Amino acid sequence: MTVRNSSRPIARVFRATVAPGCRDELLRKFHSSSAALVNSKKGCLKYRILEPVDASALEVVFESVWQDLHAVKEAFGDGWEQSYLPEGYSVLMTACSVHHFLVSENSTTK
């Protein structure tokens, strides 16, 4: 992978396919442990938890926005390109992924 080392903000998008019957528990963990984890790291600007409009859909998203790529690497270490799963998360999902995006300079927070 060719990584652009940029000073622009980085969105870290964690997507999970929820295991049957585990959606509420995974969302609780997002609101507690995932939120606490990113809030404890230097360089995290904000986070948000996204649920699908379709209540029967099995995907949920935890998105965090970081000051820059250096902040992401500092927070997650050598495994920054991989999903970080705290204890107890893996049994709540059948699949997950993490992707990183440069935040557009024209993005707004309205």
What is each stretch, according to the model?
Residues 31-39, 51-57:
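Short, charged helix-to-loop "capping" segments that act as catalytic/coupling loops
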Residues 29-32, 78:
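Residues within well-ordered alpha-helical secondary structure of globular protein domains
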Residues 5, 36-44, 65-100:
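An amphipathic, aromatic/His-enriched active-site/gating alpha helix that lines ligand/cofactor pockets
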Residues 1-10, 48-59, 84-110:
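Glycine-rich beta-strand-turn "strand-cap" elements at beta-sheet edges
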Residues 24, 70-72, 106:
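Residue-level signal for secondary-structure boundary sites
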Residues 17-30:
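Short, surface-exposed ligand-recognition loops at beta-strand->loop->(often short) alpha-helix junctions
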Residues 10-17, 48-79:
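Short, well-ordered beta-strand segments in beta-rich or mixed alpha/beta enzyme
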